[in-house]
């Protein structure tokens, strides 16, 4: 926690300074590399961690070293992770995917925006100072066309996005030659298909089957292609967004960039305060990762926060507004049906989902079926025209472990499975949202139910939190559940920050949540046996055993914290080469003792071997040369 709390003015000024001085930057002793594909423009970024050599012998004057291979790792930071790229937030990022989108020839530019709300915002001169300065003319599918990655996959087309993803998911592990680094324990994948090498055809096949999605709105060409599916690396989502009482456009852009730096695979903008439209435009134009939203939040703002006043027309206009800005996936709470609401009456914590409670209130006040459910096919038509993926929301998720796995939760899940099939009729990509608060022994059932009733569509969960007693530490309570459900097959984990249940997260909270969830996702990849997942662990263990402190810091998920903790007790430079740390000191370091035992054993082996040879020499008569038949 910070020693002094900044005022709102200071927070905004700090965020503005961050944006004004933003430059591409790499982590310590890392460099950005690119691996090219066969499609034009496919140039996949990765971070390569440079390592120091290992001392293997020689003398103090002439030491002998063995080189250690650089370790390539998945990188979500986009242009912000490349020191060679000039960053200008006012202009936005380069439109990486635009040539691919245009080459397909199935989209057209819109001369007039489809959303009445967007038209009104653009006509309001009072918003000029807040508006993103760059111009992006939105596109939509030509009449009679669908422009989704699912549509292309079903037609047997391998898109540049699919090739980009295949290269990215392999994480450059073909560059690693060391058998020590390539060693990996067998995983337990619970039925997942994990090929030794991920090909573009495998990506296409998984998307075509609905087991994976590529969130990639045609109006968000700045995004770098990524995939969400249980047969790929487990992904992590970060939530950002302003509220009625805190945060600004500058702060949200800062949080976006910060999130991608610390490993967010996607970011959800959950803004509920002022200038939602303008904030989202700044975020999208500067985001290298897919952006998701919950459209019902903004729709509610348009009717002054009165749930009963929501209409399909207002919601539809909001979908068009956001789709034409470039939102990559919508959370839609279409499974909160009128008949399910009474099932929550006996719950300890009722309906805790904001979107779920909004729709439940609307259903009860009108005594009508959820209009999102009633108009679901129209929602799919909109999504198919822009390639917006659907994240079917779990509006009836449990908000306490007492309410876990109850009738309401699974009734909604079964309905989401029915809606998945409808979305697939329109070639719309779908993932399913899950809980929530679930004790450890009840977590796996959530995964098996989802796979069975939602036809193996990717699962996307908030945690789940495994206990309710730790406000302020819910990134820990949920990280436990996230690691478990990721192992069981969950495709993406929505992070939880230390502020969960307490307040809106700040920049440091975002980092803490992401680091916790990157650990959970990586632990799940190891447990599943994802090919190459153990390389970084092996490199870290080797560096640790060899007391290569700088390499240990640089291989860490958070090099800065690792270095800071070490330097609290051994700040001098000599501490970076010492064969011990402050935990045990020089006399009790287990790894130093292990090295001494190993050296002693090797020396003993040599000594015993020499004694054996001496005895053999004497037994043969002590002759230096033997006749050939005696040798």
From Swiss-Prot:
Organism: Escherichia coli O6:K15:H31 (strain 536 / UPEC)
Family recorded in the similarity comment: Belongs to the ThiC family.
Designated name of the protein: Phosphomethylpyrimidine synthase
Sequence positions that bind [4Fe-4S] cluster: 581, 584, 589
Iron-sulfur keyword on record: yes
Gene this chain is encoded by: thiC
Biological role: Catalyzes the synthesis of the hydroxymethylpyrimidine phosphate (HMP-P) moiety of thiamine from aminoimidazole ribotide (AIR) in a radical S-adenosyl-L-methionine (SAM)-dependent reaction.
Superkingdom of this protein's organism: Bacteria
Keywords on record: 4Fe-4S, Iron, Iron-sulfur, Lyase, Metal-binding, S-adenosyl-L-methionine, Thiamine biosynthesis, Zinc
Cofactor binding remark: Binds 1 [4Fe-4S] cluster per subunit. The cluster is coordinated with 3 cysteines and an exchangeable S-adenosyl-L-methionine.
């Amino acid at each position: 926690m910070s020693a002094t709390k900044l005022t709102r003015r200071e927070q905004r000024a700090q965020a503005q300074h961050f944006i004004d001085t933003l430059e591409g930057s790499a982590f310590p002793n890392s460099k950005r590399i690119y691996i090219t594909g066969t499609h034009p423009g496919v140039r996949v970024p990765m971070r390569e961690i440079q390592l120091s050599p290992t001392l293997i012998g020689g003398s103090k004057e002439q030491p002998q070293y063995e080189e250690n291979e650089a370790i390539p790792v998945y990188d979500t930071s986009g242009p912000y992770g490349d020191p060679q790229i000039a960053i200008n937030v006012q202009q936005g990022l380069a439109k990486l995917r635009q040539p691919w989108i245009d080459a397909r020839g199935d989209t057209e530019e819109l001369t007039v925006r489809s959303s009445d709300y967007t038209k009104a915002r653009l006509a309001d001169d009072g918003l000029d100072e807040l508006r993103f300065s760059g111009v992006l003319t939105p596109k939509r599918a030509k009449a009679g066309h669908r422009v989704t990655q699912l549509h292309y996959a079903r037609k047997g087309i391998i898109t540049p996005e699919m090739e980009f993803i295949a290269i990215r998911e392999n994480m450059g592990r073909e560059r690693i030659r060391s058998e020590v680094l390539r060693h990996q324990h067998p995983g337990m994948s619970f039925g997942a298909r994990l090929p030794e090498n991920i090909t573009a055809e495998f990506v296409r096949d998984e998307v075509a089957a609905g087991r994976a999605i590529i969130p990639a709105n045609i109006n968000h060409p700045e995004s770098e292609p990524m995939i969400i599916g249980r047969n790929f690396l487990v992904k992590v989502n970060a939530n950002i967004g302003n509220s009625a009482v805190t945060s600004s456009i500058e702060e949200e852009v800062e949080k976006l960039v910060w999130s991608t730096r610390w490993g967010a695979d996607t970011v959800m903008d959950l803004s509920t305060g002022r200038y939602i439209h303008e904030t989202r435009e700044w975020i999208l134009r500067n985001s290298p990762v897919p952006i998701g939203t919950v459209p019902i939040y903004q729709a509610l703002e348009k009717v002054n926060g009165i749930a009963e006043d929501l209409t399909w027309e207002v919601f539809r206009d909001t979908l068009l507004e956001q789709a034409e800005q470039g939102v990559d996936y919508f959370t839609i709470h279409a499974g909160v049906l009128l008949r399910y609401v009474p099932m929550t009456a006996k719950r300890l914590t009722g309906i805790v989902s904001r979107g779920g409670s909004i729709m439940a209130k609307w259903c009860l006040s009108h005594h009508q079926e959820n209009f999102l459910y009633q108009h679901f096919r129209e929602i799919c038509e909109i999504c198919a025209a822009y390639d917006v993926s659907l994240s079917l929301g779990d509006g009836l998720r449990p908000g306490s472990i007492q309410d876990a796995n109850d009738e309401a939760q699974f009734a909604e899940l079964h309905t989401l499975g029915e809606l998945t099939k409808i979305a697939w009729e329109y070639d719309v990509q779908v993932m399913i949202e899950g809980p929530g608060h679930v004790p450890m022994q009840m977590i796996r059932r959530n995964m098996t139910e989802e796979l069975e009733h939602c036809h193996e569509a990717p699962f996307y969960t908030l945690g789940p939190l495994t206990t309710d007693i730790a406000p302020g530490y819910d990134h820990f309570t949920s990280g436990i559940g996230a690691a478990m459900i990721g192992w069981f097959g969950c495709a993406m984990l929505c992070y939880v920050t230390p502020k969960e249940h307490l307040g809106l997260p700040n920049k440091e909270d975002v980092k803490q949540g992401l680091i916790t969830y990157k650990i959970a996702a990586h632990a799940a990849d190891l447990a599943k046996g994802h090919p190459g997942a153990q390389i970084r662990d092996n490199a870290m263990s080797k560096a640790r055993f060899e007391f290569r402190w700088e390499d240990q810091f640089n291989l860490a998920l958070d090099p800065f914290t690792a270095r800071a903790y070490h330097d609290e007790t051994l700040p001098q430079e000599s501490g970076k080469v010492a064969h011990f740390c402050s935990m045990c000191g020089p006399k009790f370091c287990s790894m130093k003792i292990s090295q001494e035992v190993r050296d002693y054993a090797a020396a003993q082996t040599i000594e015993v071997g020499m004694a054996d040879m001496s005895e053999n020499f004497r037994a043969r008569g002590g002759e230096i040369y033997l006749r050939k038949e005696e040798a």
